[in-house]
């Protein structure tokens, strides 16, 4: 089935309007996994001309964003959460090595929190994963990757705190 951005966004809006909590986010994650299998959708929204971060839809009522991410080379992010909101990562091409982290010491403004590694896993094309409010994780991409990602709200508009791995906290 061919998906359009408009239909995809409307489906996600209906799900999140009915259930904005974790269960609703899991339903959106399942819909995203279906959309990731649609090569026409992927080609339309994740072409070579797409930057590393592009909001392709922002819901005026609920505030969630659908983003396209195209990374042409390796990238790594430090451990982070999404502040007061959530995210869903959907892998369209390439692979992302994701690490989940547990809080050792909370962060505060001007003082990074410390975290310890819990597990590593690979997001492969067609896979999606929910990161709820407060979930700490870090992605590593060793080569070109393309993702469709959700944010509960545009994270560039919110203040987030920094974290670092406990072993390197004193380095």
How would you label these PLM feature ranges?
Residues 84-102:
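Glycine- and acidic-residue-biased ligand/ion/polar-headgroup-sensing regions
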